């Protein structure tokens, strides 16, 4: 059965085409900085927003009528959902996908049913991957939707909930390994608090660290060679989450000796919820040595919640890609569309329109970022700004050649009187705009 029979395979037709079901800028074979666009972007489609979400919101019921979401045998519906998903991936031409365990398999009425159902669906996903050539970018476990996780999973006051969550992660990590996944994501959606009046912060942080340490141990025990990733988010659904932003995650990992084992998966909308730009979070992750992967989406600046819209800003993404490219690009990570169509977008075509447009935006932004990397003007001005630290005096300070006392004495003896130099921000912004808007 075909679920998108009337939708053709999406092809590159160039910027002059007016076909809404074609790529206008994403030519996957085009080479930029020595790689094809497909190799640079490593695009993934997420299972949850695309095939699981029924179109509900807090004020209304599901608006979608997807065939695989209708009542029926749960495992059969899960197989139909997988068939629809891989038909979609194949027609879109994206190389990767991502999932939560309960996206792909019915949870059942017990932990044993969960394990059995998930095992059956992992077998089926393996068959679909083999037939299509689509690969798994990352897997994860849903430790936030069921009421048992209302007070968290790893940070729950009930150790039985901790044990249930550990079981899910064990099987989700095993499945990711078996399916050839390149990363495993840990999103602590409810690892936080609603009120400090009933919360033991120290205990919950220790529980979270113990949980992560167990995941790291299991990764090595089964021989999974992919990356473990935490996805920072400041709040929602909880009032405050312990993985607030990149800097918070890095501090937490360092406190518990996990900084060499776990990196971050950065979502654009989560960055803005934390009061940061997407650019900032990516740059900070590289500076701290924990960059892993990206969830591509956007939020609405007029809303204070996670709207998970498709990315549509070449300007924003150019700066994000500039950081990624100048640090060598993705390794195991990629650009996962953690984005969903709007609730009123009920037609099957809308799923394609959202992804096609966003993929074109990624391609445009990456090419603009490549211009900034190739012309080296931003980097040259950055090097010049810090050049004095590469001189003998600057190197001596950083290498421990001075104490606070001896450095102060030296400054007094030399009568230092440093003058302020321009940061040239306006010129730098002009360089970025020239790269984005120059006619080609």
Curated annotation (Swiss-Prot):
SUPFAM superfamilies (UniProt xref): Xylose isomerase-like
Cofactor note: Binds 2 magnesium ions per subunit.
Subunit-structure text: Homotetramer.
Protein known as: Xylose isomerase
GO biological process, one term: D-xylose metabolic process
Positions annotated as active site in the UniProt record: 100, 103
Reactions listed under catalytic activity: alpha-D-xylose = alpha-D-xylulofuranose
Binding of Mg(2+) 2, residues: 267, 270, 306, 308
PANTHER family per UniProt: PTHR48408, XYLOSE ISOMERASE
Family listed: Belongs to the xylose isomerase family.
Record's subcellular location: Cytoplasm
EC class name: isomerase
GO molecular function: magnesium ion binding; xylose isomerase activity
Cofactor section: Mg(2+)
Keywords, alphabetical: Carbohydrate metabolism, Cytoplasm, Isomerase, Magnesium, Metal-binding, Xylose metabolism
Residues holding Mg(2+) 1: 231, 267, 295, 338
Lineage top rank: taxon: Bacteria
One Gene Ontology CC term in the entry: cytoplasm
Assigned EC number: 5.3.1.5
